[in-house]
Amino acid sequence: MTLNLKTPFPTFGGSTGGWLRAAEVEEKYAITWTSAKEQIFEMPTGGSAIMRNGENLLYLARKEQCLALSTQLRTFKINDYKIYRIFPSGEVQYLHPKDGVFPEKVNPGRTSVNSRGFSIGKNPNPASIKFSGITTYES
């Protein structure tokens, strides 16, 4: 995955409150998405901006800010966003969604972690296994 640095930024009249100053020394994050129309959205750093029609690129200082913006983009029915980490050396690392499928969606190749093969109503009664030597999460 490559990041096109020529992608236009959303129109934003405010500032990031100094968030990106430290990002120039350490690392910063970029989120890209495609919008079907110009519309106003809330910035994770405060204030609002106008996303451009077509491709958009926004630099943020924290990955959490990118994830917060991605949650908001999904309310606009925008699901093609990508999050990148950019190091001061210029190296770009693709972060999210890692295997091309969002974490809450089912991917045939993805193995489930910490899943139970039954619904929560079928959990054993903790009192019945209390002194059996088996922990409740292993039963």
UniProtKB/Swiss-Prot annotation:
<dbReference type="GO" id="GO:0015979">
    <property type="term" value="P:photosynthesis"/>
</dbReference>
<keyword id="KW-0793">Thylakoid</keyword>
<keyword id="KW-0472">Membrane</keyword>
<keyword id="KW-0602">Photosynthesis</keyword>
<protein>
    <recommendedName>
        <fullName>Photosystem I reaction center subunit II</fullName>
    </recommendedName>
</protein>
<comment type="similarity">
    <text>Belongs to the PsaD family.</text>
</comment>
<comment type="function">
    <text>PsaD can form complexes with ferredoxin and ferredoxin-oxidoreductase in photosystem I (PS I) reaction center.</text>
</comment>
<dbReference type="Pfam" id="PF02531">
    <property type="entry name" value="PsaD"/>
</dbReference>
<dbReference type="InterPro" id="IPR003685">
    <property type="entry name" value="PsaD"/>
</dbReference>
<dbReference type="GO" id="GO:0009538">
    <property type="term" value="C:photosystem I reaction center"/>
</dbReference>
<dbReference type="GO" id="GO:0009535">
    <property type="term" value="C:chloroplast thylakoid membrane"/>
</dbReference>
<keyword id="KW-0934">Plastid</keyword>
<dbReference type="InterPro" id="IPR036579">
    <property type="entry name" value="PsaD_sf"/>
</dbReference>
<keyword id="KW-0603">Photosystem I</keyword>
<keyword id="KW-0150">Chloroplast</keyword>
